[in-house]
Design a protein with these regions (language model features):
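PRPP-associated nucleotide enzymes
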Residues: 1-138
Length: 138
């Protein structure tokens, strides 16, 4: 999957979220149509709802997983724990599987790095592909 950084300036409007979602959905259709479809995991808050919607719209049979990366963030020591920590749920084996990791916005990559650290606690995936709704180009 290729994503072009989406830079916004005062003269460039922010793209429509539904349009971005349809583009992402269409990019993922062939990925999940393979004989061995990847596992789908969303990062809590923005990526979890995205994974839930993709799961529904792609008509996937296997459940999707969710990650709460609160304890894996590199700023945990300075910001502390959030009061609304969610449960990580990965109801499938990821060993040697391709994983599609969903998040709503990609900026610095810190959330993705934290998610990768947590995913590796569950096993060694074959690869992790990132599916984001919007790339801020940070």
């Amino acid at each position: 999957m290729t994503h072009q950084p989406a830079f916004t300036t005062p003269t460039t409007p922010i793209p429509d979220a539904e349009h971005l979602y349809i583009q992402l959905l269409n990019q993922l259709r062939p990925v999940f149509a393979q004989s061995a479809p990847p596992a789908l995991i969303g990062i809590h808050r923005g990526g979890a709802w995205l994974a839930e919607r993709l799961h529904r719209d792609l008509g996937l049979n296997e459940p999707f997983g969710t990650l709460d990366i609160s304890f894996y963030r590199d700023d945990y020591a300075t910001t502390g724990i959030r009061t609304n920590v969610k449960t990580t749920q990965i109801p499938f084996d990821i060993e040697n599987r391709v994983v599609v990791l969903c998040d709503d916005i990609l900026n610095s990559g810190r959330s993705v790095r934290a998610a990768l650290n947590e995913i590796f606690e569950f096993g060694s995936s074959a690869s992790v592909q990132l599916a984001v709704l919007y790339d801020r180009g940070g």
